[in-house]
Structure formats: structure tokens, C-alpha cells
Amino acid sequence: MGTSRYFVRKTTIPPPKRPRRIHVSPCHDTPILFGDEVKRCPWGHLAYGGSCLQSITLRDSETSMEELLPHDVIEYHIMVRLDVKTLLKFKSVSKQWMSTIQSPSFQERQLIHHLSQSSGDPHVLLVSLYDPCARQQDPSISSFEALRTFLVESSAASVQIPTPWEDKLYFVCNTSCDGLICLFSFYELPSIVVNPTTRWHRTFPKCNYQLVAADKGERHECFKVACPTPGFGKDKISGTYKPVWLYNSAELDLNDKPTTCEVFDFATNAWRYVFPASPHLILHTQDPVYVDGSLHWFTALSHEGETMVLSLDLHSETFQVISKAPFLNVSDEYYIVMCNLGDRLCVSEQKWPNQVIWSLDDSDHKTWKQIYSIDLIITSSLFFSAIFAFTPLAVLDKDKLLFYDSTHGDAFLTHDPDTKSYDLPYTSNRCATVVCYFPSLISIL
């Protein structure tokens, strides 16, 4: 006798007092004999034990999901394949489902699965959007909109993410980590780690550098050099997330040490110093970049205009120079930039009429390979001439480059190296700082 096949019919969730059940009905006439193993039926749907599960929704029925499938099958083979928004809705199915979805181990498996299986593009997050013209016309308008997100290749409009810190100026660390982003202020406000998809957030206190800077601000004093910016990343061995401030402390008149490094510990909710700190001065004008368990900085320019890439291993908390940058005789530190493209460490230099982007070879950490070249003549004809180097953000559709001018933050460009074409996929009348991220359920306990 042939095995029946079923799919789940989409219906509305019943009233709370009625049991929430799964309704199943036949999908196709041909038997699917897979045995008790999750696979895909000939029509591409998930299947288990010969039953085709075309979708997972809820309705009143005689048979519960747990009776149809063991929970470990549901968790490891079905729930892990669902996107974040769907899983957030499914938290109301049962206490067991909620417990699973809130489990850090499940959240990590779900993220790993989607990053390995999905070819989808990252989301773009705009931080502290600001329209100076609108404020001048109407002083009642809020100065800043905290967060707004969009997908570059989507026709959908950008979406505002409500937060408790509207109308406050925040900046964002250069790279996201596991769907988390880190907001910071130079000295006015405490920092915040945020999951923009789930809207979870956690505020943490100022580091010692920020406290000194705040004291200077109250006395209307300022530093004689550019202010440093923090980095945010993850110890891949322990799974611990770490915000890091590295700065040239002697230049800032903070102490007599060339550099000082502070790391925040979420377990103790306190900052601590890293000893020894960096053996090299860094460029404060450049944001640190997180790649594969380490944060990276440019070292200060030599008299010949050379710079090196400095790395901090977030597990051992040790510094080392991993490579010389592929460019020589840098005339201005604002003409170079570091970034993460597809989990690869990349550096770029603007030198008219091009801006070239190199990727560091993962095998030897010494060889640089040119992967993109931006035609500055074409980009300047599209909207304006960039004062500083463009900031590369992400790779879309496997090879299309997304980048923007960080001094304005109101226009984004894509470059297709195959067709050598350029496009303006998103523009805004408001300035912002920007970071890319992939949706996740991750939070920091």
C-alpha cells in the first residue's frame, strides 16, 4: 500500500483558547518512499517519513505537530531551515518551540545553516539618519532617525526600525558579527549592541577613553588628533563577543604609553585593559575591521607613506602585523580604506582616476590580489566627486560590488565588473553611517 503524501494548508491561527494544531492534506498522488528521514520530495518540498511538508502553518486539527514528527526532527531539520521572521512568529506555537528558538545553540545552528545555504544578499542598515535641511525648515522635526534598513536588490522600500534612542547621534562599528551591530558615541552616550532583525539590544558602559573624552567635552576642550573608533567582533574559540577600543594614548595625552587597548567583557559588564597593547601606532581615521576571529587596523603611515595591517586575535588577545599594505607612498590617510567583503580582508586606495580594491590571500596572509577597480571618472559623473576613498560594503549576486561615500552616506552605487556598468540602487536626502548584516536570532546573554 502506497504511503500518503501531505502538505500543510495555510490558514489563520485560531483563538488562544483553542488548541494550535497542524492540518495536513494530500499533496500529490505518487507515493514518496523516503523512510523516516528528512529529504525533499520530487516537487522540492521538505519531506519526512513519506509525508511532504510544503509549508508549516497552524490550524485546529486532531493531530498535533509533535504527533506527526518528533521534536528533534522538527528542530534539526525543519525549524533550522526557516528564516528569522518566521521563527519569531512561531515562538507562540508552544513553550517547547519558544524554548528552542531562544536557545543559543539553535540560534547559532540556524545562522550557520542560512549562511551556508543561502545566496541572498546582506541587509543594509542606515544609522542616525539626518536631514539638516528639514531641521532648518521645521525645528520640531527630530534631528536623527535611529535605524532604517533595506535590501539593495529588493523593490521594497526601506523600513524604519523603532528604538528607544531616537533623536540621538550614534555611529556604528565598521562590520557586523552574526547579525549583531555595535553602536557607539565618541563620549556623550553609552554604547549599544543591537540585533536589528529581532530588535533585541543591550546597553553597556563607556570605556575609560570615553570617560576622559567626556570630561574634556564638559570643559569644552578637544583632542589635538583624530578620535579613535571601536571595533566589534567575536572570539571564535569561546564564542564570546568583544567590543574593543585601541588608541594612540600618548598622542591623546592620556598616558605615556604609545597605545592602549580596552576590551569589554559582557560577562562582568566591565572594561579591562589588554597587556601588552599594540606595538605600533594606528591610524585613528580608519575604522577597525572584523574578519574571521580578528580585528584589523592600519598602522600609522611611515615617512615614506607606507602602512601595514595590524591584527588582534580576539581569543588570545595578542597583536601582530600580518602583512604590508599593497600600496606605496600614500599621500593622504583618507585615500585608503579597509573593509570586509565576503568574509575576506580587503584594502583599497583611491588614486585618480581609479580606486583599486585588493583582497588578502587567506592561505599565506601575505599576498594581495586585485579584485575590483572603481572608475572615478564614471562615479563622479553619476552624482559627485568623492572627497575621500569610497567605502566598499558588500558583494551582491556573487560578484557585484556595493559601495558608498562615507562622507555623505546618502547614495549607494553598485559596480558589475563583467559588464563594467555602474548603478545607483538607493539614494536618500538624509546622511547616515552604514553597515551590512545578515538576519539572525543571536543575542548576548
From Swiss-Prot:
It holds the Pfam family FBA_1. It comes from the Eukaryota. Residues 64-112 form the F-box domain. Coiled coil: none annotated. NCBIfam families: F_box_assoc_1. This is F-box protein At5g10340. The lineage of its organism: Eukaryota, Viridiplantae, Streptophyta, Embryophyta, Tracheophyta.
